[in-house]
Structure formats: C-alpha cells, structure tokens
C-alpha cells in the first residue's frame, strides 16, 4: 500500500513538473532548456526538494 501511494504521488509530481516546464518554455522560448526552472520567472515553481522532504517525513 505504501509503495502504491509513493508511485502515484511520484507520477503526480512528474506530471506537475512536465506541465510547469512546458508552460515556462512557452512563456520564454529563448530560455536555455537545460537550465531548469527559473524561480524568478515563475514564482510558483514547484520546490521538489521540499516535496521530497515532506514525502520522506510522511512515509517514514
């Protein structure tokens, strides 16, 4: 059960990241795609480290 929840949560975060990066790429087509998300351009960018820490804390 724990593994299923972790897999679903990871897939959800991956989809959020995919759509977030797509929206940012459309907003700034000249940006370097290998540079990663730009927190200044997108103040609501997903903080993956904080999410990973929360998942670790919740799932033990």
From Swiss-Prot:
UniProt keyword Signal present: yes
Ordered alphabetically, the record's keywords are: Amidation, G-protein coupled receptor impairing toxin, Mast cell degranulation, Membrane, Repeat, Secreted, Signal, Target cell membrane, Target membrane, Toxin
Q: Where in the cell is it found?
A: Secreted; Target cell membrane
Propeptide per record: which residue ranges? 28-45
Q: Which InterPro entries does the UniProt record give?
A: Mastoparan
AXPX repeat placement: 27-30, 31-34, 35-38, 41-44
GO molecular-function terms, A-Z: toxin activity
**Tissue and organ expression note:** Expressed by the venom gland.
GO CC field: extracellular region; membrane; other organism cell membrane
**Quick check: keyword Transmembrane in the entry?**
no
- The residues the entry assigns to the signal sequence are 1-27
- PTM sites of type Leucine amide: 59
Function recorded in the entry:
Mast cell degranulating peptide. Its mast cell degranulation activity may be related to the activation of G-protein coupled receptors in mast cells as well as interaction with other proteins located in cell endosomal membranes in the mast cells. Has a membranolytic activity on human glioblastoma multiforme cells (brain tumor cells) that leads to cell necrosis.
Question: Which family is annotated?
Answer: Belongs to the MCD family. Mastoparan subfamily.
Please state what the protein is called. Answer: Mastoparan
What does the record give as the organism's lineage? Eukaryota, Metazoa, Ecdysozoa, Arthropoda, Hexapoda
């Amino acid at each position: 059960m724990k593994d299923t929840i972790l897999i679903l949560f990871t897939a959800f975060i991956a989809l959020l990241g995919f759509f977030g990066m797509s929206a940012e790429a459309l907003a700034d087509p000249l940006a370097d795609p290998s540079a990663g998300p730009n927190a200044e351009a997108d103040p609501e960018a997903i903080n993956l480290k904080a999410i990973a820490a929360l998942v670790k804390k919740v799932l033990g």
